[in-house]
């Protein structure tokens, strides 16, 4: 696993300025949608290379608006994000921005008056309106003496091959890609094809893939960062079907995965001494003891209050025996009751609260190990229980009621202790029988344990799935639960007096009847059931690991359900152990599948929903239109040019695919341009000093006579449509 810092475009310094040259030297401009290259004809390298962007940046402190062009958009922090391109796809759409780019170009080249012939590149099948507008701009605004246009991909082919060569140009540009056949030095534009995919779409696609892969990533990835990532770390797969199937294998991830580290700020942790830690722990314990004491006091107060309330209500009930009906009704109204039934209901309510409080106290005592009940003499501990009420005064009656509650609590604890002893004895008996079976018939014991383990895994899987579905009200499980609840709620209660023709309710006679209550389980009840199943699974796995040699750690529940073993974890976190507390890992992206998925679109545009053929299908279609001899000429020079063509593995993949469709023994030569980014300009520079350029350029006089749409056709340019 390799970790790389995410690169960002940086300002490398102001663009240098140059002196003007002789007027007879052509000005060569490679006007690309990504970068513009400009220089003088006949030279080996361009003078200017900058991004084809314009930014109007306003400095709020100085109250000044600046127009920044090219690499100068990186001077200010916020200017790059608002920069715009004159191009839409690979066609010029904003002529105001294009004019500012040309002004900047001529200014840096030292041209104060345009007296140089211009050689400018354009894309394949450039719309006539766009070319005529550019011609009008150069002649009317800049007073250019002459202009000639040529296709950028063909200029690159001109630079990298001999004159009158045959071949296929794969121009993988920034906004689109083109496949152009060339036979005996002449381009065949009627067979050329365009694919609506290039470098800008690839980087945008990579950015979207990361946004989907890491929806809650703490930092927003910029398009410029995605562009650099695509060029730095993506490559073309020689066998995409095989590689994508094994891209998430552990050994492949360890070898090829790339981790991208974004900048982060780690909060400085304040380290505490051992004494401070002990003091904090003691404070927490003291606070816990204080809260427990307060809770105990509140419980006692509430219990005493309920006892007093119950005594008052019981005394009011007993008054019905000695008072007249009218006097008793008056006493009820004074106590806030409408009738005797309301009084009885309140008595039952208070008694229920007292019983719940006793059960809660009993559970708390059981959790604290208070099931070790010490046997006591009931008559001595609760002497008032056998004394008649008539022999006791008011204080004695209250004490008797308190002893009755204490006696009930004591009896419940004794019963719980007895039940626990019975359960422990039964468990010991089952364990003894299980051990006897293991010693006497090991194969049967192992098979039973494996089958039980399989059943428990299925149960907990079903529990997990059901719990997940219950969170969705529209899921089938939620709808069935509500249906069961509605069925239970709609059942009519049984009347006290049965009619002769009324059949007796036999619900519960079958075991299946009780499954209806399992169908209406809540998420909390499912969680309790899951915990019980886990306890059984862990206990069973402990035995299997100890005695079954075929049952290994890889077969355990924790290993099978380890998120690090899932495909999703490998996709998002690779082979690393992700630590949620590690700030550095929270700012990391893992580049694995995307390394080959993004470049593959040029071969299969359907991956991103583009209904077009890939470059290999287009090449096959072109070759099928020619004779075998011409096919051999075309595949003898397959040139890859353009920014997207600089990705590693492109030549190997194309040669492999061409080998599969060409006859055995065919001479196939696939090569990358010496400089895929600059060779279009270099080819135009070489061509601009030949006689062919002089014959192909349109002079100012011809422009005035024949209009802006007039061009002269030549072997490296578009046709006049």
UniProtKB/Swiss-Prot annotation:
<dbReference type="GO" id="GO:0006338">
    <property type="term" value="P:chromatin remodeling"/>
</dbReference>
<keyword id="KW-0805">Transcription regulation</keyword>
<feature type="region of interest" description="Disordered">
    <location>
        <begin position="486"/>
        <end position="507"/>
    </location>
</feature>
<dbReference type="InterPro" id="IPR004000">
    <property type="entry name" value="Actin"/>
</dbReference>
<keyword id="KW-0539">Nucleus</keyword>
<dbReference type="GO" id="GO:0045815">
    <property type="term" value="P:transcription initiation-coupled chromatin remodeling"/>
</dbReference>
<feature type="coiled-coil region">
    <location>
        <begin position="266"/>
        <end position="368"/>
    </location>
</feature>
<dbReference type="GO" id="GO:0006355">
    <property type="term" value="P:regulation of DNA-templated transcription"/>
</dbReference>
<dbReference type="GO" id="GO:0031011">
    <property type="term" value="C:Ino80 complex"/>
</dbReference>
<comment type="subunit">
    <text>Component of the INO80 chromatin remodeling complex.</text>
</comment>
<dbReference type="InterPro" id="IPR043129">
    <property type="entry name" value="ATPase_NBD"/>
</dbReference>
<keyword id="KW-0227">DNA damage</keyword>
<dbReference type="GO" id="GO:0005634">
    <property type="term" value="C:nucleus"/>
</dbReference>
<dbReference type="Pfam" id="PF00022">
    <property type="entry name" value="Actin"/>
</dbReference>
<comment type="function">
    <text>Component of the INO80 complex which remodels chromatin by shifting nucleosomes and is involved in DNA repair.</text>
</comment>
<protein>
    <recommendedName>
        <fullName>Actin-like protein arp5</fullName>
    </recommendedName>
</protein>
<dbReference type="GO" id="GO:0005829">
    <property type="term" value="C:cytosol"/>
</dbReference>
<keyword id="KW-0804">Transcription</keyword>
<comment type="similarity">
    <text>Belongs to the actin family.</text>
</comment>
<dbReference type="GO" id="GO:0006974">
    <property type="term" value="P:DNA damage response"/>
</dbReference>
<keyword id="KW-0156">Chromatin regulator</keyword>
<keyword id="KW-0175">Coiled coil</keyword>
<dbReference type="GO" id="GO:0005737">
    <property type="term" value="C:cytoplasm"/>
</dbReference>
